[in-house]
Amino acid sequence: MPEINFAQIEYAVRLILEAIGEDPNREGLVDTPKRVAKMYAEVFAGLQEDPKQHFQTVFSEEHEELVLVKDIPFYSMCEHHLVPFFGAAHVAYIPREGKVTGLSKLARAVEAVARRPQLQERITATIADSIVEALEPHGVMVVVEAEHMCMTMRGVKKPGSKTVTTAVRGVFETDANARAEVLSLIKA
């Protein structure tokens, strides 16, 4: 993946400022192109990461029951409008043959996937698929809830509305009780 081109971003931001009728040389804006480039490097850092890398450390435990990390806060940037959306991810999996990962690794994978121009549906599926590929669990269920600024500050202008997406893999695809257990624990 190519590195962030700071100079190109700075140039583009100057063009945007000029295109909306602003003076990029006025006091409050003179450093804005540099700040935006630095911010993009941070908020799009996930482009440089493979979420599966966070699951390289695994532990062998005699545990094949549900593991759920809920309310993992995240932010991302809508790839359609380049405005933020943010919310919480809930990640559940059922280990196979005692193959578990550190709980923080689930949160790190969420962050790696979210920190790129993205769609919420893709975040949800990519997290689930990364866990399946890396840990080979009996099942994975990911639920993502988010508020999208593209619906809050433009277009329909509906602040507070949330989008919920799910991805189910393995036993969660066929076992309604397993899905219901995860959903009830998320609400608890």
From Swiss-Prot:
Disulfide bonds: none annotated. Zn(2+) binds at C78, H81, C150. One of its GO terms (biological process) is one-carbon metabolic process. The keyword Repressor does not apply. Keywords: GTP-binding, Hydrolase, Metal-binding, Nucleotide-binding, One-carbon metabolism, Zinc. It comes from the Bacteria. Toroid-shaped homodecamer, composed of two pentamers of five dimers. Belongs to the GTP cyclohydrolase I family. This is GTP cyclohydrolase 1. It comes from Geobacillus kaustophilus (strain HTA426).
